[in-house]
């Protein structure tokens, strides 16, 4: 019996090969960057891309955003055929645009259209950071301007969801010009008593944050969204000081009076419905402070 203990055959565990490790289809699981929990992507999508464990708000593409907000089958897109060119002859720019078109099934970094939210008509623009990081080039600026003009002509509110790394460097000063163009269009719309609602999502930075994203009658943001003009390290190096940990977050901006509210994605549609209803029928906004 004692002899058997020392002569017992060793057992070995089999280690999966590299090929076996890759048998899990890409994209079926998603890891939360905040709490590190791994979850099924389809379950995350069902939860409007909000982590079920820590409430982290993952980026949404334009299609997902529109489906989560607009009344069913009410959204009609316009100007979807507009395509960016390469006015400065920037090397490789057209190839990058084509690659993003194939990856996202979008022609540009913003989707614009008209539909209803809770039965209330509105023109909506939704930026998509998966296309050139949501950067603002000539076509993005033109589509947003045309959407504002459409809202003005139809006398309906204009709602924009921003997600952008800023102006598109491959278009140089032409992209920077979109800051003035979109801001001017919003000014003219506002003079006609048009309602402007801006919702800043992660990330909203650079020239976008410094122009139309901050010009709403109501400026909202999603929890944890990065919002700012220059990068954190650049600011610290310029002023020679360490910035607060929560600097440039939605919560920091709310605390310092630069936002009207930080709204959880679950509450976004109802909040917009209430606002649109209030501006159509009259009322107060005390509920927004709850």
Swiss-Prot record:
InterPro entries, per this entry? AcCoA_carboxyl_beta, Acetyl_CoA_COase_Trfase_b_su, ClpP/crotonase-like_dom_sf, COA_CT_N, Znf-ACC
GO MF terms listed in the record are: acetyl-CoA carboxylase activity; ATP binding; carboxyl- or carbamoyltransferase activity; zinc ion binding
Q: What class of enzyme is it?
A: transferase
Q: Which residues bind Zn(2+)?
A: 32, 35, 51, 54
What this protein catalyses is: N(6)-carboxybiotinyl-L-lysyl-[protein] + acetyl-CoA = N(6)-biotinyl-L-lysyl-[protein] + malonyl-CoA
What are the start-end ranges of the zinc fingers (C4-type)?
Answer: 32-54
HAMAP family to which the protein is assigned, alphabetical = AcetylCoA_CT_beta
Q: Which family does it belong to?
A: Belongs to the AccD/PCCB family.
Recorded protein name is: Acetyl-coenzyme A carboxylase carboxyl transferase subunit beta
